[in-house]
Amino acid sequence: MSQERSRLFRSAKTRLSLLLGLLMFTFGFLKVVNPTIDGWFHVQIQQSHLPHSAILMGKIAEIMTGILFLLPRLRLWSAKWEGRILLIACSSLFLVMLVAVYVHLQPGVPPEVLPLGIKPPVIPLFVLLLDAMVAVPAWKDIQSEGLPIS
């Protein structure tokens, strides 16, 4: 791969990870401080027949995922650690979005409590695509550095 193309992918990975970090942290934080959004989230979880503990776990997962995406941007890390942190963030976001897709597909969840009132899981699937666009270059960076994952 050419140097210019590699730099372009690295730049896109950096911007997307920053965007995903800000989005996840913001929405997780809003679920904690905004009663309206928190109410919607409660309805989503309850109508999906997920356990009550999923409410707190979902909020924590969104905030922590956001922090993990932002962490490499807040401090300089070696390439080894930056790649590992981003892959953990991508894995966490993957799980959160799988739950979001599940919630969207539940017939008992009304569209009014979903983001933008959209019942099909368009938003979680789009976020999964963005997640893959960060994970693949992060994985390739680790592999090209010859750095073991374990």
Question: Residue ranges of each PLM-predicted region?
Answer:
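Membrane-interface extramembranous regions
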Residues: 2-150
